[in-house]
């Protein structure tokens, strides 16, 4: 596995035009048909970019995404070009991209987050308690926080601008945005990818509770998997050995993802008051940063063991 030792909060490539900075990735144009996606070490929680980077995070996210793109290639085409990211920047810029970047096809993005849930957690659990459904999908009575669902469900979200909250939407709303044929294709493909990945992860002692996919259309109109896939930033990763006890106690299972930081941010008090989830975020203490970095490393090590 390639890793970089330097910490990168924000890339600063001058040889390519910057198109956008997302919560984690900086995207640069390479001609008219490709993008260079640089995964920084930034961390976002509650749709706010935190001030402190997590050392090694960008490289780990990139290696994990490449691992899954390779494993899922038979199910769905992806946006990778197969070319080395280092080939499109100057020699001086290589340290900023090595091990943490992907050179990808430029696609027409679909403005829907394709979320699949195999377990009830996070915003899904909150919504279930109010309506016994998630995104309009009715669920059985009596489920608890972190319950395994009878079968995975497709619970899409509207893609938000940076700094805005993604909003859960119904399948019918997806149909309105992309049409019935493409909506059905996205739903079927998302569930198939999730089921394949979740079954594999389980053999490594990891529960993928839920995940978020992003798709685009290529020049031929082919639905193509893009952005990141099945990383701890886009998924809830739970180690199997901590799940049963937490579930029985009605608690969030221990996780390999950002939940650790989310829980700390929920508990922290600023002048005696909870953080209101708007910028600026509270400063993460060094032990939270190091524990978060260790969780990303452990997830990758376990998955690829």
Curated annotation (Swiss-Prot):
Signal peptide start and end residues: none
GO CC list: cytoplasm
GO BP terms: 'de novo' IMP biosynthetic process
Segments passing through the bilayer: none
Enzyme class, UniProt record, top EC level: ligase
Entry GO MF terms: ATP binding; phosphoribosylaminoimidazolesuccinocarboxamide synthase activity
Record's keyword terms, sorted: ATP-binding, Ligase, Nucleotide-binding, Purine biosynthesis
Pathway noted in the entry: Purine metabolism; IMP biosynthesis via de novo pathway; 5-amino-1-(5-phospho-D-ribosyl)imidazole-4-carboxamide from 5-amino-1-(5-phospho-D-ribosyl)imidazole-4-carboxylate: step 1/2
InterPro entries, per the entry: SAICAR_synt/ADE2_N, SAICAR_synth, SAICAR_synthetase_CS
EC number(s) reported in the record: 6.3.2.6
Nucleotide-binding found in the keyword field: yes
Reaction equation(s) it catalyzes: 5-amino-1-(5-phospho-D-ribosyl)imidazole-4-carboxylate + L-aspartate + ATP = (2S)-2-[5-amino-1-(5-phospho-beta-D-ribosyl)imidazole-4-carboxamido]succinate + ADP + phosphate + 2 H(+)
Family of this protein: Belongs to the SAICAR synthetase family.
Annotated PANTHER family: PHOSPHORIBOSYLAMINOIMIDAZOLE-SUCCINOCARBOXAMIDE SYNTHASE
Protein name (Swiss-Prot/TrEMBL): Phosphoribosylaminoimidazole-succinocarboxamide synthase
Gene from which this protein is expressed: purC
